[in-house]
C-alpha cells in the first residue's frame, strides 16, 4: 500500500489525504496474497482449449474402450493430444536452430541428453567446460512493461534464453590435480553484453580436484569468491580468458544452450504426445 501512496504528487496535499480517508483500506488478507507467477512458456492455445465447447466432456468419467484393447481412452486425452500437436507445430515454427550452433575457438562438443561438454587442448593443457540445460531458463521479471493492445500474440511472448551454470576444468599434461572453476551468469548482467569492461559471467567457486576422479571430494578446500580480494579475482578471470573462456565464449555458450534447451523441449513434447496417445 505504501508504494502506491508515495506515487501521489505532493501538490495534492490535503485533498489526497481526504481521499485516502474516504476509501476503506483493503483487507489484509488480500494484501498478503502472493502475486501470480507468469508462465515461462506461453501456451497460447491453452486458453482456446479451456473455453471450447468440449470442456464439459473432460469432466465426464472415462467409459470402457469400444475397441476392446483394454486401454483408457478419454475425451481429456484426445484434447491433450490435439493441444500437444498444435504446440509442437508452433515450437518448431519459432525454432531458430535446426542443428546445434558451433562454438568458435576449436571447441569440440559432446552432448549426452541435457548435459553438454566442450573440450579444447591448448599448449599442454586440457580445458573442459560442462553445463546442463535443466532449470537453466531464468524466470521472467514482473516489472516488464505490458504489451499494447495492438501488438500481435507473437510479439507479446518474451524470448526465452538459457543461461546455465557451467564448470571449467583445467588439467595440465601429466598433472595430478585439476583446477575447477564454477561459473554462472548473474541475473543483473544478462542483456548487458555490450557494456564496456563488463563481464557477463562470474566465477563463484574455485577448487582443486584429483585428475581422473569421477566424483569431486567435499573434503578438498573450496574458495568462495564472494569474500575474495578483487585483484586475485581479476587474475582468475584473466586466466580463463587466456584459455578461451571470455565474454565471446559466454555469449556463444548461451546461444548453444538455448538451442539445446529448445531442442530437448520439443523432444519432450513429442514424447509426451506419444505417451498420452499410446494404446
Curated annotation (Swiss-Prot):
One example GO MF annotation: deoxyribonuclease inhibitor activity
Membrane topology note: Peripheral membrane protein
SUPFAM superfamilies (UniProt xref): Mitochondrial glycoprotein MAM33-like
Location of this chain's protein in the cell: Mitochondrion matrix; Nucleus; Cell membrane; Secreted
Annotated region described as C1q binding, given as residue ranges: 74-91
Modified residues (N6-acetyllysine): 89, 92
Keywords linked to the UniProt accession: Acetylation, Adaptive immunity, Apoptosis, Cell membrane, Complement pathway, Cytoplasm, DNA damage, Immunity, Innate immunity, Membrane, Mitochondrion, mRNA processing, mRNA splicing, Nucleus, Phosphoprotein, Ribosome biogenesis, Secreted, Transcription, Transcription regulation, Transit peptide
Regions that span the bilayer: none
Transit peptide: 1-71
Pfam family, one: MAM33
Disulfide bond positions: none
Gene Ontology terms: cellular component: cell surface; cytoplasm; cytosol; extracellular space; GABA-ergic synapse; glutamatergic synapse; membrane; mitochondrial matrix
Matches recorded under InterPro entries: MAM33, MAM33_sf
Phosphotyrosine found at: 185
Tissue: Ubiquitous.
GO terms under biological process: apoptotic process; complement activation, classical pathway; cytosolic ribosome assembly; DNA damage response; immune response; innate immune response; mitochondrial RNA catabolic process; mRNA processing
Modified residues (Phosphoserine): 198, 202
Region (Interaction with MAVS) location: 166-210
Similarity-based family: Belongs to the MAM33 family.
Quaternary organization: Homotrimer; three monomers form a donut-shaped structure with an unusually asymmetric charge distribution on the surface. Interacts with CDK13, HRK, VTN, NFYB, ADRA1B, FOXC1, DDX21, DDX50, NCL, SRSF1 and SRSF9. Interacts with CD93; the association may represent a cell surface C1q receptor. Interacts with KRT1; the association represents a cell surface kininogen receptor. Interacts with CD209; the interaction is indicative for a C1q:C1QBP:CD209 signaling complex. Interacts with FBL and RRP1; the respective interactions with C1QBP are competitive. Probably associates with the mitoribosome.
Job of this protein: Multifunctional and multicompartmental protein involved in inflammation and infection processes, ribosome biogenesis, protein synthesis in mitochondria, regulation of apoptosis, transcriptional regulation and pre-mRNA splicing. At the cell surface is thought to act as an endothelial receptor for plasma proteins of the complement and kallikrein-kinin cascades. Putative receptor for C1q; specifically binds to the globular 'heads' of C1q thus inhibiting C1; may perform the receptor function through a complex with C1qR/CD93.
Protein name: Complement component 1 Q subcomponent-binding protein, mitochondrial
Taxonomic lineage from the root: Eukaryota, Metazoa, Chordata, Craniata, Vertebrata
Underlying gene: C1qbp
Amino acid at each position: 500500500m505504501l508504494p502506491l501512496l508515495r506515487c501521489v504528487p505532493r501538490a495534492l496535499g490535503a485533498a489526497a489525504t481526504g481521499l485516502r480517508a474516504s476509501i476503506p483500506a483493503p483487507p489484509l488478507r488480500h494484501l498478503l496474497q502472493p502475486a501470480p507467477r507468469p508462465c515461462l512458456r506461453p501456451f497460447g492455445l491453452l486458453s482456446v482449449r479451456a473455453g471450447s465447447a468440449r470442456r464439459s466432456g473432460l469432466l465426464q468419467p472415462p467409459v470402457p474402450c469400444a475397441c476392446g484393447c483394454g486401454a483408457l481412452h478419454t475425451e481429456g486425452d484426445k484434447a491433450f493430444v490435439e493441444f500437444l500437436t498444435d504446440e509442437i507445430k508452433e515450437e518448431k515454427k519459432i525454432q531458430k536452430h535446426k542443428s546445434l550452433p558451433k562454438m568458435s575457438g576449436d571447441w569440440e562438443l559432446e552432448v549426452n541428453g541435457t548435459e553438454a561438454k566442450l573440450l579444447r587442448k591448448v599448449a599442454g593443457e586440457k580445458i573442459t567446460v560442462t553445463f546442463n540445460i535443466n532449470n537453466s531458463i531464468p524466470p521472467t521479471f514482473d516489472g516488464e512493461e505490458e504489451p499494447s493492445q495492438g501488438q500481435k500474440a507473437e510479439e507479446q511472448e518474451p524470448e526465452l534464453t538459457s543461461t546455465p551454470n557451467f564448470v571449467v576444468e583445467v588439467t595440465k599434461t601429466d598433472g595430478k590435480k585439476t583446477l575447477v572453476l564454477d561459473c554462472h551468469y548473474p541475473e543483473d548482467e544478462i542483456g548487458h553484453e555490450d557494456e564496456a569492461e563488463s563481464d557477463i559471467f562470474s566465477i563463484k567457486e574455485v577448487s582443486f580436484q584429483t585428475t581422473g576422479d569421477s566424483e569431486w571430494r567435499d573434503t578438498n578446500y573450496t574458495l568462495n569468491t564472494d569474500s575474495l580480494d578483487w585483484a586475485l579475482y581479476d587474475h582468475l578471470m584473466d586466466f580463463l580468458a587466456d584459455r578461451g573462456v571470455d565474454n565471446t565464449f559466454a555469449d556463444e555458450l548461451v546461444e548453444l544452450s538455448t538451442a539445446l534447451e529448445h531442442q530437448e523441449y520439443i523432444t519432450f513434447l513429442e514424447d509426451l504426445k506419444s505417451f498420452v496417445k499410446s494404446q
